UniProtKB/Swiss-Prot annotation:
Belongs to the thiolase-like superfamily. FabH family. This is Beta-ketoacyl-[acyl-carrier-protein] synthase III. Its EC number is 2.3.1.180. It holds the Pfam family ACP_syn_III. Residues 250-254 are annotated as: ACP-binding. HAMAP family: FabH. GO terms for molecular function: 3-oxoacyl-[acyl-carrier-protein] synthase activity; beta-ketoacyl-acyl-carrier-protein synthase III activity. GO terms for cellular component: cytoplasm. It comes from the Bacteria. It comes from Streptococcus pyogenes serotype M6 (strain ATCC BAA-946 / MGAS10394). Catalyzes the condensation reaction of fatty acid synthesis by the addition to an acyl acceptor of two carbons from malonyl-ACP. Catalyzes the first condensation reaction which initiates fatty acid synthesis and may therefore play a role in governing the total rate of fatty acid production. Possesses both acetoacetyl-ACP synthase and acetyl transacylase activities. Its substrate specificity determines the biosynthesis of branched-chain and/or straight-chain of fatty acids.
Amino acid sequence: MIFSKISQVAHYVPQQLVTNNDLASIMDTSHEWIFSRTGIAERHISRDEMTSDLAIQVADQLLTQSGLKANAIDFIIVATISPDATMPSTAAKVQAAIAATSAFAFDMTAACSGFVFALAMADKLIASGAYQNGMVIGAETLSKLVNWQDRATAVLFGDGAGGVLLEASKDKHVLAETLHTDGARCQSLISGETSLSSPYSIGKKAIATIQMDGRAIFDFAIRDVSKSILTLMAQSDITKDDIDYCLLHQANRRILDKIARKIDVPREKFLENMMRYGNTSAASIPILLSEAVQKGQIRLDGTQKILLSGFGGGLTWGSLIVKI
């Protein structure tokens, strides 16, 4: 049988740094108010780089690190809710920029679960035997979706990209997965709604910026995500002691605190970087993974079991346990 493995990781963030104190100068907030509620102190904001620019930086790094030729890449999946345009896809721009002429490329929209969903799909593509090498990138410029007068949401989000190179392997590395969607709760977190504008339409007011029911999302993350992780471990006969690190979507420090208690895993196993990047949606998990590899916490030698878990708009949530 053929399986997939993560062979390379990379990330990139824009240079512009915006601190909580910077935000306090343009809206009614403070560093203390933001940090005490979220664990976020600063975030990176793009000045002129589009989502594709961030993703291209990651793709270039992955190619350089791997030593592969661009035409050896079979597919590119970009998980994003902030594409450059609805057409062409962000992934198509990445494919062109790195000259991966043999690769098919497409975007996936699953909000903050996007990277996990895309990685699960990429694993199946390689397991089919038809493809050998693929890139999965989470990339966001959420700053263009934020209402900068709304302190409830503007303080949360940042821009960035992270990704992995997947290669075919004889050994199984994706050990377990669970993916979920509950569209009935979709109005809890929305952004980028468009208006009907044909000569025949009655019309509908667009909701361009991010709008969130914070309490509903907080409760959803603690209840549904914790339950799905516990079910996943039980079904796969993987215990909490088998897990070396937990890399969850970087939305809020208090969410991580509560999930750690719910699933009874030591809090120190939960890596985090939201303090420096904020919530980067589909990019948060791969950025966290890339930094953990840089720091030597995760070795990419196939000896560690890592829980990856995303949750967000849709509502969507999903987890993978991977041997890395």
